Amino acid sequence: MNSVLNSGRNTICDAYNVVVHDPFSFQHKSLDTIQKEWMEWKKDNHSLYVDPIVGTVASFLLKKLGSLIGKRILSELRNLIFPSGSTNLMEDILRETEKFLNQKLNTDTLSRVNAELTGLQANVEEFNRQVDNFLNPNRNAVPLSITSSVNTMQQLFLNRLSQFQMQGYQLLLLPLFAQAANLHLSFIRDVILNAEEWGISAATLRTYQNHLRNYTRDYSNYCIDTYQTAFRGLNTRLHDMLEFRTYMFLNVFEYVSIWSLFKYQSLLVSSGANLYASGSGPQQTQLFTSQDWPFLYSLFQVNSNYVLSGFSGASLFTTFPNIGGLPGSTTTQALLAARVNYSGGITSGSIGGSNFNQNFNCNTISPPLSTSFVRSWLDSGSDRQGVNTVTNWQTESFETTSGLRCGAFTPRGNSNYYPGYFIRNISGVSLVLRNEDLKRPLYYNEKRNIESPSGTPGGARAYMVSVHNKKNNIYAVHENGTMIHLAPEDNTGFTISPIHATQVNNQTRTFISEKFGNQGDSLRFEQSNTTARYTLRGNGNSYNLYLRVSSIGNSTIRVTINGRVYTASNVNTTTNNDGVNDNGARFSDINIGNVVASSNSDVPLDINVTLNSGTQFDLMNIMLVPTNISPLY
C-alpha cells in the first residue's frame, strides 16, 4: 500500500497553474489579477486570519517601486485601502488580528480607533482633492498654496499615527499601524517626486527628504521592537511559532522591508523574506522559545542558495489488529527519515532517522524552474472509525505549479500556499531536537543530521517545513546547483539576496542572519577575507551598484566584476547608518560604482570583505540601480 501512495500523482489545475517558467511573472501580472488571487486564497485558507488586502497592498507597493509610471502613489493606495471611501477593509484587518491573537479592544478604544480610521480616510481624500485642484486650475478653485496643503497633511499624519500605538494594544494594532505608515511614507515620497510640478521650494524638498529617512527609521524600529518583544515571550510548539511569524510578516514586515527602499525608483525587488510553514499535528509537542530560534532559523535557511528539486526518505504504513482478539485495528503512517534534494546532486543532512532504506522520492518531474513547488500539506492527526479503529495519519506532501502532487503520504488537512510565493526550500525537524543542536546554529550550507536524542520513544520521526518566498528571476541552475540570477531585459534595476550566493569561502564562519527592515536576510561574515560569489545573467546594461551593509567596526569591501575591481575602504556603519536597528545590524547603502552586466553571458560578481579585529559585518542586500535615477536621499 505504501508504494501505491507514494507513486500516485494527481494532476490538478489551480489558479496558479503555468506551463513555462516566467522569471518576471510578478511584473507581468496586473494588480487586478493579484487581488483576485488573494481573494481566492482567503476562501480556501481559513486557518490563518489574514485579510486578503494585506497581500494586495504589498504587491502594489513593490510594483510601484519597480516602475517609473505614476508619481502619486498615495492616491492609488488610498483607493485600495479605503475603496469608495469605506474603512471596512481596515476594520477587517483589526477583526482578523483580534481573532488571531485572541485579544480584543475594549469598547472605548475600538470607537477611538474607528474614528481615527475615518479621520485618516477623510484627510487623505481631502489632500488628494486639493492636489487635483492645484493641477487642474480651470476645473476647480486653486488652493492658495500646495505647500500649505502638504504641511497640513504631514501634521495630520503625525497626529493620527500615534493613535495606532496605544499602550497595552501595540501588538494588536501593529497591522493597522503598518497600513497607516504605508500611507504616510507614500505621501512623503509623492511630495519628493512631484516637488517640481507642485512648485515645492528647495528648502521644503530637503525637509521632506529628511522626513522620508527619519520616519522610515522611526516606523521600522517601532515595528521591529514591537514584534521582537512579543516573539521573545513565546513558549510554544513549532507550528504556532511559525504561524505567529508568518502572520506578522504578511501584515507588517512585507511593508517594513519595502520602506527602506522607497528612496529608489525603477528597482525590481527580487529578494525578499521567507515564510515558514509546518504541521499542527498532536505528535509535535516540544515547546520552543526565542532562544531556540537562531538554530531553527538556520536549519530552515541553510541551503537557500540551491535550486530545490524535491525530497526523499523512508515512510512507514502499518496496520495492526487490536490485541486480545478485540475487533478493530490501529493504522499508523509515519515519516521516519527524509533528505532534501537540490539540482546538481546536492542533498541536505538526514532529518529524523539515518539508518532507513529510502522508499519514496518526491520531485518536480519537469525541470524545477519550470514547475516549482507552491503548496504543501504538513499536518498530522488521528481519525477514529467507530470505537476500536484508529488511523494515525501524516501528510508531508507538496504540489507544483503544474498541479502534480507528491510526498510521503496523501495530501489532507490544511494546505500552505501564498499567492505569488514559491516553495524555494524544504527543511524539517525530528520529533525532539537535541540540546546540542539547539545551541549551535548551522553555518552556511552546513550538512548536519537532525535526529532526536538517543532513546527518545518514537524518536525516528521527521516532520517537514516548507520555505516560501517570492524569488523568481532565476535564469538557470549553476553547475554546482545554485541559482543564476536574471537581470531584466529593460533598464529596470534589480536586487540580489546575499544568501543566494554561488559559493562562499570560509563557510564555517559564515552564517545567515534574520532581518526585518530589509528585503530578505543577510550573510554575516565572522572571518576576514571572506568572499561571496554571485552569478547573474547580464543584459549589457550599466548599473550603479549599491551594497547594503552593516559594519560595526571598520571593514574594506572589494567587488570584482568583468575583471574590474572596485574598493570601498574604511566602511563603518556604527554611527553612519540609516538609523534602523535591524536585529543587531545598522545598515547603510554603499555606492560601489558603475558596473556593466555583460550581455547574454553569465557574469560572476565577487564581494570580498576584509575585517578589522572585532568587526561585526552583515552583507544585507545587493542592488543594481539604474544609472540615470538618483536615490531620493
Curated annotation (Swiss-Prot):
UniProtKB keywords: Sporulation, Toxin, Virulence
Keyword Hydrolase among UniProt keywords: no
Note: Toxic segment of the protein is located in the N-terminus.
Protein family: Belongs to the delta endotoxin family.
Gene Ontology terms describing biological process: sporulation resulting in formation of a cellular spore; symbiont-mediated killing of host cell
SUPFAM superfamilies: delta-Endotoxin (insectocide), middle domain (SSF51096), delta-Endotoxin (insectocide), N-terminal domain (SSF56849), Galactose-binding domain-like (SSF49785)
Sample GO molecular function, one term: signaling receptor binding
DNA-binding is among the record's keywords: no
Residues annotated as transmembrane: none
Protein name: Pesticidal crystal protein Cry2Ad
Function noted in UniProt: Promotes colloidosmotic lysis by binding to the midgut epithelial cells of insects.
Record InterPro entries: Galactose-bd-like_sf, Pest_crys, Pest_crys_dom-III, Pest_crys_dom_I, Pest_crys_N_sf, Pest_cryst_cen_dom_Cry2A/18, Pest_cryst_cen_dom_sf
